[in-house]
Amino acid sequence: TPGSQPQPMDLRVGQRPTVEPPPEPALLTLQHPQRLHRHLFLAGLQQQQRSAEPMRLSMDPPLPELQGGQQEQELRQLLNKDKSKRSAVASSVVKQKLAEVILKKQQAALERTVHPSSPSIPYRTLEPLDTEGAARSVLSSFLPPVPSLPTEPPEHFPLRKTVSEPNLKLRYKPKKSLERRKNPLLRKESAPPSLRRRPAETLGDSSPSSSSTPASGCSSPNDSEHGPNPALGSEADG
């Protein structure tokens, strides 16, 4: 071209950068409508997306209802299954319920640690049941009525006498007296009667009969009671 300046020669050794040739005017005229068409296409797509957003938002609320229906269907299937055919894979509903139970237990444990004195489970007060009245009514329905006994006993029905404590003491007193040890100084009942001694005679009164018969001085009470002394009888005869 007449207006172009001469470019210096590149004397560098190695890989040379590629130099794009300047675009020709014919190519520029062809690229302009393509760019315009592309711009219009992108603008149409953006408008379609904006118009589709309200429709998508209007269709979003039914999704939870569909999920609830699916959960109910899964629960029914689990209930209708036999125990032998139940699978070990837990469904999403079961997992959710397990997570809720675990969270409740963790919260209860935290409350116990924070407030140990307060009871974790509120107990309700139970009223006392009238078991005696119910038992009596049931027994009265099965058993025949018992005639009421009179308060005062009749004359032909004597009361049984019981042994009182003083009577027992009197009954056992003789046994205690028998068991006692007797006095050893007392004379036995089985022993023979004691011999009676004659009174001492005066010194001046000394008879030959008394000296000749020494046995006459000591006489047994049995001899004096039953009969005369044989020695005295012989002296009288002589």
Curated annotation (Swiss-Prot):
UniProt keywords, alphabetically: Chromatin regulator, Cytoplasm, Hydrolase, Nucleus, Phosphoprotein, Repeat, Repressor, Transcription, Transcription regulation
Region listing for Disordered, in residue ranges: 1-26, 47-72, 145-238
Biased composition range(s): Basic and acidic residues: 176-190
Name recorded for this polypeptide: Histone deacetylase 7
Region (Interaction with MEF2A): 58-158
GO biological process, one term: neuron apoptotic process
Main subcellular location: nucleus
Localization annotation: Nucleus; Cytoplasm
Molecular-function annotations in GO: 14-3-3 protein binding; chromatin binding; DNA-binding transcription factor binding; histone deacetylase activity; histone deacetylase activity, hydrolytic mechanism; protein kinase binding; protein kinase C binding; protein lysine deacetylase activity
Role of this protein: Responsible for the deacetylation of lysine residues on the N-terminal part of the core histones (H2A, H2B, H3 and H4). Histone deacetylation gives a tag for epigenetic repression and plays an important role in transcriptional regulation, cell cycle progression and developmental events. Histone deacetylases act via the formation of large multiprotein complexes. Involved in muscle maturation by repressing transcription of myocyte enhancer factors such as MEF2A, MEF2B and MEF2C. During muscle differentiation, it shuttles into the cytoplasm, allowing the expression of myocyte enhancer factors.
Known catalytic reactions: N(6)-acetyl-L-lysyl-[histone] + H2O = L-lysyl-[histone] + acetate; N(6)-acetyl-L-lysyl-[protein] + H2O = L-lysyl-[protein] + acetate
Entry comment on modification after translation: May be phosphorylated by CaMK1. Phosphorylated by the PKC kinases PKN1 and PKN2, impairing nuclear import. Phosphorylation at Ser-164 by MARK2, MARK3 and PRKD1 promotes interaction with 14-3-3 proteins and export from the nucleus. Phosphorylation at Ser-164 is a prerequisite for phosphorylation at Ser-190.
Source lineage: Eukaryota, Metazoa, Chordata, Craniata, Vertebrata
Amino acid composition bias (Low complexity), ranges on this chain: 206-221
GO cellular component: cytoplasm; histone deacetylase complex; nucleus
Subunit structure: Interacts with HDAC1, HDAC2, HDAC3, HDAC4, HDAC5, NCOR1, NCOR2, SIN3A, SIN3B, RBBP4, RBBP7, MTA1L1, SAP30 and MBD3. Interacts with KAT5 and EDNRA. Interacts with the 14-3-3 protein YWHAE, MEF2A, MEF2B and MEF2C. Interacts with ZMYND15. Interacts with KDM5B. Interacts with PML. Interacts with FOXP3. Interacts with RARA.
Family, as annotated: Belongs to the histone deacetylase family. HD type 2 subfamily.
Parts forming coiled coils: none
